[in-house]
A protein has these predicted regions:
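Active-site regions of metal-assisted phosphoester/phosphodiester hydrolases
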Residues: 1-120
């Protein structure tokens, strides 16, 4: 997990485990980190789970998903699964508004397609 604190927000990039138990353990640590700031806290990366999964449902108790839940990102060559997300911690994201969201048409840079969210 990479955490970068900027003047107006905190951005956390992660690649979560393939196992649900490990993802849940990571989520507990991430929530503790998010609780420690008053700035908007963003969490993005490969969560290794689909939107309807128990893990994503648990995540949504504290984080709002800003990226498109219906836009597949994996595998990059022919995306069929939505497992990459951009989220924001609900307690610090109240004033954020999504102005656009998309999955970039970039099949070669990674095994996942990049996701882009623009906010105001």
């Amino acid at each position: 997990m990479l955490v970068a604190e900027f003047k107006k927000y905190v951005f956390c990039c992660t690649h979560l485990s393939l196992t649900e138990a490990d993802r849940m353990a990571s989520l507990s640590l991430i929530k503790e980190l998010a609780k420690g700031t008053r700035k908007p806290f963003f969490l993005a990366g490969d969560f290794n789970d689909e939107p309807a999964s128990p893990f994503i449902q648990t995540l949504q108790q504290d984080f709002v998903i800003l990226s498109d839940l219906n836009a597949p990102t994996f595998p990059a060559s022919d995306p069929e699964n939505t497992i990459d997300y951009i989220t924001a911690y609900k307690k610090t994201a109240r004033k954020l508004k999504v102005t656009s969201q998309r999955v970039a048409n970039e099949p070669v840079a990674s095994d996942h397609r990049p996701i882009v969210v623009e906010l105001r």
